[in-house]
Amino acid sequence: MAAKKSFKIKQKLAKAKNQNRPLPQWFRLKTNNTIRYNAKRRHWRRTKMGI
């Protein structure tokens, strides 16, 4: 990744960074909740974003 990034690329990276986190614990305790973990988790080395 270049040191000089366009604003569009920087926005994409920021969004990906925010999405890449586990579920909050309080969310798992909600009634009738079937979601156990974040299925869309991304590892920086295993899966590249393609930008």
UniProtKB/Swiss-Prot annotation:
Domain of life: Eukaryota
Keyword Glycosyltransferase: no
InterPro entries hit by this protein: Ribosomal_eL39 (IPR000077), Ribosomal_eL39_CS (IPR020083), Ribosomal_eL39_dom_sf (IPR023626)
UniProt keywords, alphabetically: Ribonucleoprotein, Ribosomal protein
Region Disordered: start-end pairs: 1-21
Record-linked PROSITE patterns: RIBOSOMAL_L39E
GO cellular component: cytosolic large ribosomal subunit; preribosome
A GO term, aspect molecular function: structural constituent of ribosome
Keyword Iron recorded: no
Quaternary structure and partners: Interacts with YIH1.
Protein name: Large ribosomal subunit protein eL39
